[in-house]
């Protein structure tokens, strides 16, 4: 298991909107306008929260890919019935497969990298020391520069939906068993497997990146201390 570094552009918090009222305006007796954003984050609407995202387009696609497969699974047959009365199950199944695959790819390659600065992939390497031609499965983790700004809204939405979607699929799987919908159960098992794979991989990637950054910081401080002590011109 190894880790590599990928250069991801630095994110900076968005500037305060021009119409926002600052503390000095309140002291001067200025009245807040109705169109101004409330300075209390706890009272923000979902639209206001999403506007504070560092990558709003990536965040919207991430939310859509996470939620849409579940909604289509629940309500898809109803809406497909308005389009065609034949082969509804086949069309419903194909649409779900495409959405689940798109969600897996988007989360693994786009959303994780932009929203939280993490990415992972799997490699199969040949074991040179093996005489039987064996291969080993290697998980490779990438993390952004520790100095990169991670937007708290992006991070919270990312981790909430990362762990929340597998739970929803498990509940739907239990309902499919109770209804004897075993063909749908196969699709749900695939969705659970892919969701758990991403959840496990990003959890390990996050822990590995934090441990790597901690070790790097410790070594840099230790080497700096040793060099300063060995330097005869260093001030004491």
From Swiss-Prot:
Keywords: Golgi apparatus, Membrane, Transmembrane, Transmembrane helix
Membrane topology according to the record: Multi-pass membrane protein
Keyword Cell inner membrane included in the entry's annotation: no
Domain of life from the UniProt record: Eukaryota
A GO cellular component entry from the record: Golgi membrane
Subcellular location: Golgi apparatus membrane
A Pfam family assignment: DUF846
Entry coiled-coil feature ranges: none
Similarity section: Belongs to the TVP23 family.
The protein's name in its UniProt record: Golgi apparatus membrane protein TVP23
């Amino acid at each position: 298991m190894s880790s590599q570094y990928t250069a991801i552009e630095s994110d900076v918090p968005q500037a305060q909107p021009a119409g926002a009222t600052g503390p000095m305006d309140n002291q001067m007796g200025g009245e807040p306008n109705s169109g101004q954003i409330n300075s209390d984050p706890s009272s923000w609407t979902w639209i206001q929260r999403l506007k504070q995202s560092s990558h709003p387009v990536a965040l919207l696609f991430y939310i859509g890919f996470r939620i849409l497969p579940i909604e289509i699974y629940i309500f898809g047959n109803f809406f497909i019935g308005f389009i065609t009365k034949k082969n509804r199950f086949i069309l419903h199944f194909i649409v779900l497969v495409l959405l689940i695959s798109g969600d897996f790819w988007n989360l693994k390659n786009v959303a994780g990298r932009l929203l939280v600065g993490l990415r992972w992939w799997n490699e199969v390497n040949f074991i040179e020391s093996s005489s039987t031609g064996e291969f080993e499965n290697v998980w490779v983790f990438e993390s952004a520069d520790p100095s990169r700004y991670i937007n708290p809204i992006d991070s919270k939405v990312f981790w909430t939906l990362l762990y929340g979607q597998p739970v929803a699929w498990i509940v739907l799987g239990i309902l499919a068993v109770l209804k004897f919908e075993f063909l749908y159960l196969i699709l749900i098992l695939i969705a659970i497997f892919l969701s758990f794979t991403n959840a496990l991989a990003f959890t390990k990637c996050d822990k590995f990146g934090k441990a790597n950054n901690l070790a790097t910081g410790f070594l840099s401080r230790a080497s700096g201390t040793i060099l300063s002590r060995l330097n005869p011109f260093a001030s004491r």
